[in-house]
Amino acid sequence: MTKMNRCAALIAALILPTAHAAQQQDIDAVIQPLMKKYGVPGMAIAVSVDGKQQIYPYGVASKQTGKPITEQTLFEVGSLSKTFTATLAVYAQQQSKLSFKDPASHYLPDVRGSAFDGVSLLNLATHTSGLPLFVPDDVTNNAQLMAYYRAWQPKHPAGSYRVYSNLGIGMLGMIAAKSLDQPFIQAMEQGMLPALGMSHTYVQVPAAQMANYAQGYSKDDKPVRVNPGPLDAESYGIKSNARDLIRYLDANLQQVKVASVARRWPRRTSVITSAGAFTQDLMWENYPYPVKLSRLIEGNNAGMIMNGTPATAITPPQPELRAGWYNKTGSTGGFSTYAVFIPAKNIAVEMLANKWFPNDDRVEAAYHIIQALEKR
């Protein structure tokens, strides 16, 4: 090592701990009041700037045991799982197993001759199939699910409305796994996740990892974990830790090495809502950056999830928006998640909590953290 290189290494060794401490103070100022406001037992905040990752753990994984949150603590990520399912479909497409242009009925013989002759995989991947949000309560097995799909009739033409849908992304996950000739969980855990280098991300948490699985808490402080049900794995089934999830965001920023089959990421513009709040990509939502906090809150509020919004296809699809705020919320009964990355800034933030609290507060917290990161 030359004298100049030794000096550079010494300077870096002195600067990095100071920068980390300053970043910790910025994040403390945002997260500690938020945890107090909602009585959140534990959180993990993962930050990446130019590929340099830091994990900031807060509180406990279980109020009963008092075990602290660490970077290995597993959280339910809720609907952030939908982005993994969309990525699995891209993973299958890269192997020439499917095409997003094809109708869903091309891959599912049980729904041929139904409304799905006119619903493309791209519609399923962008919440524009018209399918409703929830699987009906009386649908409890695959036969009943397929019967529901066969009988379903859309209220609007495919592509004309954005309707946030577990049923839509669930069908896409079924098709992606079928095209790979594997059960969904196997395709995810043994195929795509290893290709991403995510070794502590699961649909089914193995026995050896249960000690790392945080206890979730409902808004009224009851201990809860996600319940099994039709399309749960495809829609909201992922459990992961802060280290794996910030790697996932960095992969979207192309800041980490992944297997060659996993080098294209599902961020391409495909549909925009006429309300103008955001552009809908393959499960990720994006906003031109810089963006006002009020616009982010509008796009992530409950109304955008529960109510349909007119949508217009962008044709041809545009290149990815580098100056964009890409985000996705995720919730289960006892966990809260918010993920955001900004390609033009090479910044990513992942927020994980073992208690449910509103999206607005998650978005605002991440917004202030990113503002602080940009000032450093």
UniProtKB/Swiss-Prot annotation:
Residues the record lists as binding substrate: K328, T329, G330
Protein's cellular compartments: Periplasm
Cellular compartments per GO CC: outer membrane-bounded periplasmic space
Signal peptide interval: 1-21
Gene Ontology biological process: antibiotic catabolic process; response to antibiotic
Keyword Cytoplasm on entry: no
SUPFAM superfamilies: beta-lactamase/transpeptidase-like
Superkingdom, natural source: Bacteria
Main EC class the enzyme belongs to: hydrolase
InterPro entries, per the entry: Bact_CellWall_Synth/Modif (IPR050491), Beta-lactam-related (IPR001466), Beta-lactam/transpept-like (IPR012338), Beta-lactam_class-C_AS (IPR001586)
NCBIfam families given in the database record: bla_class_C
UniProt function note: This protein is a serine beta-lactamase with a substrate specificity for cephalosporins.
Additional notes on this entry: The class C beta-lactamase family has a specific amino-acid numbering system known as SANC, for structural alignment-based numbering of class C beta-lactamases, or else the simpler name structural position. A multiple sequence alignment was used to derive a consensus sequence and then the consensus was numbered taking into account insertions and deletions. This allows use of identical numbers, e.g. for active site residues, despite differences in protein length.
Family affiliation: Belongs to the class-C beta-lactamase family.
Protein name (Swiss-Prot/TrEMBL): Beta-lactamase
Organism for this UniProt entry: Serratia marcescens
Gene name per UniProt: ampC
